């Protein structure tokens, strides 16, 4: 996943931090953190002061993602690390990221602390399946949006709607349907789901999610 304010979610000397009695191994990198939660390895990395990339893979199953879309080399970015209760925080001069190492939830806010988007607690799912003899995963990620938040994007859809809230769309390029798993919010952020396989986008009062057939 890429967070653009910007954000990407790719579904795919260390400091050990113990927060509120919950021993969580959170390793600091130059511009982010890595940690394991809910049997998932997670990497949070600032690509610039306005771009955060989130990379998730099943625990101890590393996968080198050679994205056809995310070709940018991370810029040198000053990142401040801290703690907020049991959570770990990291921020640039534009974006604040708050990670719950226990639930896997991630909150993205602007520099004033206004919440932009939430990567939902326990919201990541990897489901194993056999892809023509090759072990693979279905992958699903859920987010929380504001009730009245308007989002645009998802490519060239033939629904006659501009606001993509409260819809279920099957994202696969065909005929006049050109699908791009990218949304832009009126709150001033954008989200790119870095996966090329057929994907179901769903938004309802409970959550917004991307559910991809293959963890590409």
Predicted segments, located by residue:
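Bacterial N-terminal signal peptides that target proteins for export
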Residues: 1-9
């Amino acid at each position: 996943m890429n967070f653009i304010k910007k954000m990407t979610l790719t579904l795919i000397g260390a400091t050990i931090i113990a927060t509120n009695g919950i021993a969580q191994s959170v390793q600091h990198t130059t511009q982010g953190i890595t940690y394991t939660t809910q049997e998932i390895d997670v990497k949070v990395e600032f690509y610039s002061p306005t771009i955060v990339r989130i990379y998730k893979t099943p625990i101890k199953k590393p996968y080198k993602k050679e994205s056809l879309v995310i070709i940018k080399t991370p810029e040198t970015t000053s990142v401040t690390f801290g703690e907020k209760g049991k959570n770990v925080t990291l921020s640039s001069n534009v974006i604040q990221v708050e990670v719950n190492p226990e639930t896997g939830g991630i909150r993205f806010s602007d520099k004033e602390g206004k919440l932009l988007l939430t990567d939902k607690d326990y919201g990541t799912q990897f489901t194993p399946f056999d892809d023509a003899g090759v072990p693979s995963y279905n992958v699903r990620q859920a987010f929380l949006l504001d009730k009245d938040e308007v989002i645009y994007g998802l490519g060239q859809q033939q629904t006659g709607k501009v606001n993509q809230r409260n819809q279920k769309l099957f994202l696969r390029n065909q005929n006049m349907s050109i699908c791009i798993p990218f949304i832009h919010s009126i709150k001033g952020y954008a989200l790119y789901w870095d996966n090329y396989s057929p994907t179901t986008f769903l938004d309802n009062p409970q959550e917004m999610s991307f559910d991809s057939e293959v963890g590409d």
